[in-house]
Amino acid sequence: MKKRIPTLLATMIATALYSQQGLAADLASQCMLGVPSYDRPLVQGDTNDLPVTINADHAKGDYPDDAVFTGSVDIMQGNSRLQADEVQLHQKEAPGQPEPVRTVDALGNVHYDDNQVILKGPKGWANLNTKDTNVWEGDYQMVGRQGRGKADLMKQRGENRYTILDNGSFTSCLPGSDTWSVVGSEIIHDREEQVAEIWNARFKVGPVPIFYSPYLQLPVGDKRRSGFLIPNAKYTTTNYFEFYLPYYWNIAPNMDATITPHYMHRRGNIMWENEFRYLSQAGAGLMELDYLPSDKVYEDEHPNDDSSRRWLFYWNHSGVMDQVWRFNVDYTKVSDPSYFNDFDNKYGSSTDGYATQKFSVGYAVQNFNATVSTKQFQVFSEQNTSSYSAEPQLDVNYYQNDVGPFDTRIYGQAVHFVNTRDDMPEATRVHLEPTINLPLSNNWGSINTEAKFLATHYQQTNLDWYNSRNTTKLDESVNRVMPQFKVDGKMVFERDIEMLAPGYTQTLEPRAQYLYVPYRDQSDIYNYDSSLLQSDYSGLFRDRTYGGLDRIASANQVTTGVTSRIYDDAAVERFNISVGQIYYFTESRTGDDNITWENDDKTGSLVWAGDTYWRISERWGLRGGIQYDTRLDNVATSNSSIEYRRDEDRLVQLNYHYASPEYIQATLPKYYSTAEQYKNGISQVGAVASRPIADRWSIVGAYYYDTNANKQADSMLGVQYSSCCYAIRVGYERKLNGWDNDKQHAVYDNAIGFNIELRGLSSNYGLGTQEMLRSNILPYQNTL
C-alpha cells in the first residue's frame, strides 16, 4: 500500500485534470425521474365542501341511497381520485350528523391517488366524508418522493396524513429494484412527522432477512425524529473489529441527543458515546460523554493503574443573554494521556499535545467589558505532567474614543496561576495597561500613533525547589514597569490595469511601523503563560513577540512591508502578494536565559515574512507563505498549496508544510516540542484528490510523506458507490499514532471502514467526497 497509494493518486490527479464533463445528470434528478409527480392542479380548501365528479360507461341506482357505476369508472373530489372497473356508491343518513355518510366500494383494477400517495389493488373502499381509504392486496407509491411497497391491506387515515399497512413492506428503491426493504406486521407512515413506524420489523437485503426488531422507526424526510440511525462498521489494528449503532433522540424542539453503542472487539467491551445538543436563552451548546467501562488492552499495557475505565467529556457553549452577558465554555478532558491514540474522536486527535478546560462569563456594554474565566490544561505526556492553570482570571477593558483627536483604552488583568505539581512556582499577577491613540486618515492612507504604559506586579510563592536548582533566582515580589511607543502608517494606491483584463484593478499598499519598548530584565519572573507567537506577514506588525504577559521583549525596530492586490470587475480578489521585514536597531531581549537566541546579540534585518494568494481561474488557486528568522537559523516556517477544484466532488490539491526544529522548540511547550517525532522539525509533502470515476462511483485519496524521516505520515483511500436507494462507502487509512521510545520507531494505525447509507429517506444524494475528505486525520482545507 505504501507505493500503491501515490501511484493511484497520480492517476486520479491526471484524470481529474483532463476528464471531460461527460457525467450523467445529478443523481437526485435521476432518482426523481422514477418517482411519480402530481400533475393535476392543486385544489385548496375543505374537501367536504368540494363537489364529487363521477364518470363511467354505465350507471344505475336507487336514489338517493345507492348507485352502481361500471366501465372505466373515474371519481374525483378535490385532489383525490378513485378509478376502478366497478364502483358502488352508498349514502346513508347518520343520526346526529348534518351530512349523510357517503361510502364507496371499488372492484377490479382499483387505482387511488392524491397529491401524497398512489394505491393500487383489486379491491378498495373509501369514505368520501372523512377521506379514509382502504385497498386490499395491492401496492403503493409515494408522490413526489421516494418510497413504495406492498401490503395485504393499505389504509389512508387522518385526511391522508397516515398510510397504514397490514403485513406490508417499505423501500425507498425505485420500481424494479428491491435491494433493501423493511417488512412488518403493521407499518404506519406519518407524513406530518415524516416517520415510518414498523412493528415486528424484518430488514431484508434482496429476499434475505438479516435483521429483526419488534419495533423500528425510519425517517422519511428531513424532519428531526427519534429512532435508530444506520449502523456502520470498521476494522483497525488498534481495536480490531468495531461496530456502531447510533440512536437519535429528539428530546424537545431545543434539544436532542445521539446515543451510540460502539463495540470494540480488542477492547472487549462497548463504549457508550453520548452527544447532547441544546439551545437555551444563554446560548447554544454541545456536550459529549464517552464511557468505556473496562479496557483489557489498557489493563495489559498499564498493570499499575487502579482502573481501566476510559472516558471523554467535551463541552462547548457560546451565547449571549440580555444583550450584555456572554457565556463561553471550551472544555475537553479524558481519562488518560493515551486516549486519543487509542480512539478516534472528532473532539481531539493523536496529534494534540494537551486538552483545554476553559470557562468564562463576560459582561459587555458600550465602552466597557469584563470577563471572569478559569483555564486549565491536561497535558498528554507521561514524562512531563507540569502545566499551569489560571484560577481565576479577570480581564477588564474600558474604551473612550473621540476624546478630542484621541482614542483611549484601559486594559486590566488579574490572574492567579496554579501548577499541577506541588513543587513548582505559583503566582498572582496584576497588570494595568492604559493606551492612548492618535488616529489620522484620509482616502489614500492612515497613520496611527500609539503610546502605552505597561505596569505588572507579581507575587510569587513556592519558590524553594526551583531556586535551589537554578542559578537565576526568582523573587517573591516583582514589579515591572515599561512604556511602549508605536507609529504605524499605511497607504493604498490604486490603478486600473486594462492591459490584463477589462475592469481589473491593482492596489499597492505599503506599510511601515516603528516600535519602541525598553528592556526590562525578567529573569526573576517565572514563565507562566508566554510562548513565541507564530508569525506570518500580518504577524510582523504585532507589538508583542510573545503571547501572554510574562515575557515582554524589548524593541527598537522598524517593520516595513508592502502588499499588492488585483481585483476583477466584480471586485473579487484574484491575486495578492505581501512581503515584509523587521529591522532591529538593538537586540530584542527579555533577560530569560532559557531563550537561546538572546545570547547571540543580533541586530539588523532578522525576520522576513511573505504571503501570497493567486486565484488563477474559477478552478485553479494557489496559496503560500514563508518566514525567515536568522535568530532561529534560516527558514522558520513555510507552507504552500495549489488546488484544482471543478466542484465539491472533483478536486486535486498538492501541499507542502515546513517548520524548523528550532521554531518548534521555541513555539511549543517543552514537553511537546521535544517529542521524538518533532526533533528534526516538520517537512511534509501531501496530495489530496477526489473525483467521480463513473456515473455513481466516487473515489478520494490523500497521501502525506515526511521528507525528514523519509516515512509516510498519513494516507487515506475511500471509495463510495451511490444509488437512488443506498450508498456504500469503503475506506482505508494508515496514520501516524505515536512513537515507540523503546524500539525507536513510529507507530502506525491501519483502519478499514465500511458504511452503508439508505438513500431516498432524506434529501441527501451526495457522492460522499466531502465527508471522506473531512474524516482524515489531516483534513482537507479549501485553497480557493
Curated annotation (Swiss-Prot):
<keyword id="KW-0732">Signal</keyword>
<dbReference type="InterPro" id="IPR007543">
    <property type="entry name" value="LptD_C"/>
</dbReference>
<feature type="disulfide bond">
    <location>
        <begin position="31"/>
        <end position="724"/>
    </location>
</feature>
<comment type="subunit">
    <text>Component of the lipopolysaccharide transport and assembly complex. Interacts with LptE and LptA.</text>
</comment>
<dbReference type="InterPro" id="IPR050218">
    <property type="entry name" value="LptD"/>
</dbReference>
<feature type="disulfide bond">
    <location>
        <begin position="173"/>
        <end position="725"/>
    </location>
</feature>
<comment type="similarity">
    <text>Belongs to the LptD family.</text>
</comment>
<keyword id="KW-0998">Cell outer membrane</keyword>
<dbReference type="Pfam" id="PF04453">
    <property type="entry name" value="LptD"/>
</dbReference>
<dbReference type="InterPro" id="IPR005653">
    <property type="entry name" value="OstA-like_N"/>
</dbReference>
<protein>
    <recommendedName>
        <fullName>LPS-assembly protein LptD</fullName>
    </recommendedName>
</protein>
<dbReference type="GO" id="GO:1990351">
    <property type="term" value="C:transporter complex"/>
</dbReference>
<dbReference type="GO" id="GO:0015920">
    <property type="term" value="P:lipopolysaccharide transport"/>
</dbReference>
<dbReference type="GO" id="GO:0043165">
    <property type="term" value="P:Gram-negative-bacterium-type cell outer membrane assembly"/>
</dbReference>
<keyword id="KW-1015">Disulfide bond</keyword>
<dbReference type="GO" id="GO:0009279">
    <property type="term" value="C:cell outer membrane"/>
</dbReference>
<dbReference type="Pfam" id="PF03968">
    <property type="entry name" value="LptD_N"/>
</dbReference>
<keyword id="KW-0472">Membrane</keyword>
<dbReference type="InterPro" id="IPR020889">
    <property type="entry name" value="LipoPS_assembly_LptD"/>
</dbReference>
<comment type="function">
    <text>Together with LptE, is involved in the assembly of lipopolysaccharide (LPS) at the surface of the outer membrane.</text>
</comment>
<feature type="signal peptide">
    <location>
        <begin position="1"/>
        <end position="24"/>
    </location>
</feature>
